[in-house]
């Protein structure tokens, strides 16, 4: 029993017309054009050498150590995400990766397309998803929530790249959610639709923040946002721009989303933050206070919430936005936001006197910082 020598390896490869150049890790191999389809990888060359020497001369021994196979963190997170979307009412769809050339003619063309309509690799999903929603609504399925995890193909810096993305569309309320709307299918507003997406993504426990959209022309500029993961732009969410739906009478309100899968899953698996953490259960109740303010529309809700958390760090446990009221009788630049503030002390039950001063100082800080006015 022995290992193959370098001379035996080079001799067999040269026998089939390969040209070899010695490098630091072994050889660089040039393959004849007529063998380029079957000799693409290192394992193909190994199989060819074994064939020429004779399979019967090799020792039939299984490599050690043998370890059971398992899913990678990326695969586990992807499956977890898929199940979460399905559990939250979304339907998974599958669309062609081949599409027709767009008006900008910046899609990657394939060399020998069967038909003109399938001559390029897709660079986005939203065109096909709009068609799916349109077909469902025309078929009587008024509430259509879909998602798809797949690859897009882009040309960046004169180099073709492949990126995995999470995409989807949300239109109207699902049938099982119509019990409180007298059986009528009504459109979701921006915040409700964004909440549905956030609920589906919460399984990975990754913080996703929004900033105003200034890039994606197929989205409504005032009802869309760029999604940030760990400070990096990683996708978008928003209502489709009316110009995209010109001539379409079946779709009223439609929200699209696209998220870079690598950025999302890397953020979740790097520290395994999607793995549940156990904490001590709070044995004392919290005190909740609802507070409403009139803000200028230029202020972003996330900035307001971050300011509240920054001002009070000791007793303030949670801040959530519970209501938005845009009264047409108010000034065009003003909007009412209502927040719910939860206070809790881990060691004792809070009394009204414990939080009254803190709560009042918080209100004054918000009014000063954002030039807002509390509504009572």
Report the location of each language-model feature:
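Short glycine/proline-enriched turns and hinge-like loops at secondary-structure junctions
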Residues: 40-41, 104, 121, 140-143, ...
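A general structural signal for short secondary-structure junctions and capping/turn motifs
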Residues: 83, 87, 117, 136-140, ...
